[in-house]
Amino acid sequence: MVKKTIAAIFSVLVLSSVLTACNTTRGVGQDISEGGSAISGAGTKAQQ
């Protein structure tokens, strides 16, 4: 019984960590994309 409880708690902690990592990765990807768009826009303005 104790082992099942510990395993359940551990599983919840691992799952929450994985979900947090996914959201963090998505946020980093969006930040990089926005940075690339800003650089592209600056390059276009410089060419004009």
Curated annotation (Swiss-Prot):
It is a lipid-anchor. A lipid is attached at residue 22 (S-diacylglycerol cysteine). A lipid is attached at residue 22 (N-palmitoyl cysteine). It comes from the Bacteria. GO terms for cellular component: plasma membrane. InterPro entries: Entericidin. It is found in: Cell membrane. GO terms for biological process: response to toxic substance. Residues 1-21 form the signal peptide. Its main location: membrane. It holds the Pfam family Entericidin. Keywords: Cell membrane, Lipoprotein, Membrane, Palmitate, Signal. The keyword Cell membrane applies. Belongs to the EcnA/EcnB lipoprotein family. Plays a role in the bacteriolysis. Is activated under conditions of high osmolarity by the factor sigma S. Entericidin A functions as an antidote. This is Entericidin B.
